[in-house]
């Protein structure tokens, strides 16, 4: 990755499949990266960290229809970690969870992978430290809740989509300053968990938006509502105040 920043002109507008040496796991680890054509190393660029769902991969979430197109349109760099493997849960279900050939500390390694990839990206690119966003689908949505609450000083806003939400909503008390957009289909079995977390955000008077999509399932909501997701992210920087960088159009109500 040391030469990645120097080669940026050749890699702009492309989704790259990269690897790094995951020392804690003792193996190379894949991640995916999208660099917008507008990227200029002299200017600070917003970053989205994207967490894939159970059984999926870093490259798969980057291929969600419209994801990189919206990143290109709005000038975001996007990075998607593996989370150790396709079932690591990013630490949202504890430090263990390994079975079969998985390491016993699978959850710990899954979380560490995300933070390593974030660190590598911040090192290689001129990232706007006030505009680092975290989003994820399904298992990745659960990871978004977990990592949002564990590292609350990093994120400008969160975007859990059809999240496999942890049981403990008290985690929200550590991140009341972070704006959150939740996108959830009402035909998805996970809708009850999403409603529970949204109710807790209301109770805590958190800045949030909840899009419950009528007729929406578990998968289709993940790629049909990028306009609302990016509009929300555009509206906030880490200061927790509406950002004047871009005035978003209000998201349509479901």
Report each predicted region and the residues it spans.
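Alpha/beta-hydrolase fold active-site loops
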Residues: 43-46, 156, 178-179
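Primarily recognizes the serine-hydrolase "nucleophile elbow" in alpha/beta-hydrolase
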Residues: 63, 120-126, 130-177
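Short beta-strand/loop motif that positions the catalytic acidic residue
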Residues: 181-184
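Acidic catalytic loop of the alpha/beta-hydrolase fold
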Residues: 186-192, 219
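Histidine-bearing beta->alpha loop at or near hydrolase active sites
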Residues: 213-219
